[in-house]
Regions:
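Hydrophobic alpha-helical transmembrane segments of multi-pass inner membrane proteins, especially
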Residues: 18-34, 38-240, 283-341, 368, ...
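Transmembrane alpha-helix interface/packing and boundary motifs in multi-pass membrane proteins
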Residues: 86, 153-159, 254-258, 337, ...
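Re-entrant/interfacial helical elements at transmembrane boundaries that shape
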Residues: 167-168, 264-269, 300, 342-350, ...
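Long extracytoplasmic/lumenal interhelical loops at the membrane interface
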Residues: 246-292, 319
Length: 383
């Protein structure tokens, strides 16, 4: 493999994408300096270290021709699968999930990198399996993509990490729909979503005379079931299952239009807000900087999505296009779920906000994904 950047690649560097990403990273570190202010451990310094490592990794990814990455998609995918399996034997358990490898003071979450592995492998499958005379996928051709998705989805789900499993599922579904599927499969998917909604309504919303085992509750872990209950009716148990959602909405709502000011947030300062440097980092931002700056942050995320889709539409091959769509889908669904969770529209799932939340594995995986977008854009006129 050759590591190089040629002069003719430079005009195709997506500077808008890079600026938007670095702007969100800078706002994230600034926000973490407030979320982790004394007397608590200041994590923003560690996040700066992780950012430095991540930027170095992005530069390395940009130096490699992404056609070599295409050839390595299967080994990358299999390596991540093996890491997920190894978690069952050597993983570190925290917050009820066996999701991390602990190496001294550092922890690594393989599921974060599995998301990239799934995107790369799906892109390779759709590139290699392309048939000009049959562009859309029926059930007989769809088994390969579904198998690629099912194995990591199941391994992450049994950790149990429902949030990350859902992110793998949603980003993969976006890629599969982008790859064109037959209309009857889309109709089946819509029916399945409606059926799932009916089941959840039956389990959690419809009043029943006495507690009873139901379809969803029987298969979910206790804390997962409590999160759904707390989402649907947070006021029913404000000190238990509804605590996270209630405190988060108080923080977001109290920020008003312009916010309370940096390090002036009461929910943050008094530590009422749980996981405020990770899952609920957007609540800190909303309380201290208000509605206007929340819009600024959303505009930056929107710019990342638009520039990323532009990379996909201008890619010179199917692999590059599918990788770009997969990366954008992965980031979009993660932002959608995290902010939806913070404002009470979606249940709490433990999903972090890309580039804003504290965490080395999360930041590195997102930046590697951005590196893939930059790589594809730089080489769109190379072959």
């Amino acid at each position: 493999v050759q590591l190089r950047i040629e002069r003719r690649m430079v005009p195709h560097i997506p500077w808008g994408l890079i600026f938007s990403v670095l702007a969100v990273c800078a706002l994230g570190i600034w926000n973490l300096a407030s979320a982790s202010r004394p007397p608590h451990s200041p994590v923003w310094g560690s996040q700066m270290l992780y950012l430095g490592v991540s930027i170095t990794a992005v530069l390395v990814v940009c130096l490699v021709d992404y056609r070599w990455i295409q050839r390595m998609a299967a080994p990358i995918y299999v390596t991540n699968i093996l890491l997920l399996i190894a978690l069952r034997f050597f993983g570190h358990t925290a917050k009820g999930a066996e999701s991390w490898f602990a190496i001294g003071p550092f922890r690594m979450q393989p599921a974060e990198f599995m998301k990239i592995g799934v995107v790369l492998m799906l892109a390779k499958v759709y590139h290699d399996d392309f048939q000009p005379n049959e562009p859309s996928y029926g059930l007989t051709r769809l088994w390969k993509p579904l198998l690629v998705v099912f194995v990591p989805f199941a391994l992450v789900l049994v950790q149990p990490d429902l949030g990350t499993a859902l992110m793998i599922g949603l980003s993969s579904l976006t890629i599969i729909l982008f790859g064109k599927v037959r209309w009857y499969l889309v109709a089946t998917l819509v029916t399945a979503v409606l059926a799932a909604g009916i089941v959840i309504w039956n389990d959690y919303i419809r009043d029943v005379p006495e507690p009873r085992p139901t379809i969803v509750r029987h298969h979910l872990k206790k804390h997962q079931s409590q999160r759904i209950s707390g989402w649907l009716d947070p006021e029913a148990d404000l000190r238990g299952s509804g605590y996270h959602a209630a405190q988060s909405k108080i923080a977001v709502g109290s920020g008003g239009v312009s916010g309370k000011g940096w390090r002036e947030g009461t929910q943050t300062g008094l530590r009422f807000l749980p996981e405020q440097h990770t899952d609920f980092i957007f609540s800190v931002w909303a309380e201290e900087h208000g509605f206007v700056m929340c819009l600024v942050l959303l505009v930056l995320y929107g710019a990342i999505f638009i520039f990323g889709l532009g990379v996909g539409f201008n890619a010179r091959d199917r692999f590059g296009a599918f990788v770009a769509v997969g990366v954008v889908a992965m980031l979009f669904w993660q932002v959608f779920e995290n902010i939806g969770m913070v404002i009470g529209l979606l249940p709490v799932t433990g999903i972090t906000l890309p580039l804003m939340s504290y965490g080395g594995s999360s930041l590195l995986s997102v930046m590697l994904s951005i590196g893939l977008l930059v790589n594809i854009s730089m080489r769109r006129h190379m072959f």
